[in-house]
Amino acid sequence: MRTATGGASGAMRADGRDGPEERVQGSRTDALGVAVLVGWATWSLIAAAGRPAPPDGLLLALLAVTAGYATGRIAGALLPVAAPAGMALAIVVATLVMPGRLSGAADTPPLGYPNADAALLVLATGAACCAAWSAPSPPLRLVLRTLGAGAGALALALGSTAGFAASVGVLLCSLAASHMRRRLLALVGFALATAIAVGGTYAVATDTLPSGLSASLAGQLTAPRVELWRDAVGMAEDHPVRGVGPDRFRVESAGALAATEGPPTPQSAVFQVAAEQGFPGLALLGAAFAWVLCTLWRSPRSTPVVLTAGAALTGLSMLATVDHVLSYAVVTAAAGILAGLAAARPLPD
């Protein structure tokens, strides 16, 4: 009989199929996700209305997440081991074989930006460890965990210390997940960790930390990045409802205009959404992350698989708090795939 270790919903029937209560709960969670994503897409159109603010970038990101999630649900149901293992291997191979690998130059594979590549590798670590927990034999589990560790080492080789630290965190959380009896506590911990990261960046941007600590963090994050964050906070305060409009941060930001070769974003998903779509957009971003955690809580997969995926997605959220890695549709699609894999209901043997 299949069981969902530490799950929040009812147990499966003896024939391996979901019971009526579990199907209803899963449908409600899916409906909630649809409502959040559709609401966010609608709000982006409202924020763009009446001004030269194309919402294409956000709509593409939402489409990538949705398509990735659907793909992950299907692949995870059919191939609970091969699908996440294939995802992890594909990311690692793409990072290794593309021209300019490990150089940190403009053509660094596969996205042309080392930190975005590192974000993909964090997801690869999570996918490999999810596959390891679903693998039937200890040797295969060892191989898959080695693949996950290799993805983390590759992030360090690309020059992303934050990506390496996130991958190590995913590995440690995955190894510890078997000792967690209730997944809800761990998922709440992931939410709190993300909230602390967001609060910390806001404190740096508004210079509300003690002077010594603020100067130290600003030095590590770089002064131009912190200046962009301050511009974004100012825009959100001046335009709290609709923001300045999607894709208009660079036009409105003195810091971004000064750095003509820099990124057209505040290098933070949180600050970008707040500046360009106001506080309603920021609330929808938080609701989307909360929905992902709720989906993992209700997932019929084992607790180690769920918490491993949750750790990887939390690592990605922390990277997105201090960099614009979610501006890449490939990253958002990969995040959707991993969430779908962890939420899938494997078909009965």
Annotated model-derived regions:
Residues 210-248, 262-272, 276:
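Membrane-interface loop/short-helix elements at transmembrane-helix boundaries
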Residues 24-31, 131-145, 182-188, 293-310:
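Membrane-interface helix-loop-helix junctions at transmembrane boundaries of multi-pass membrane enzymes
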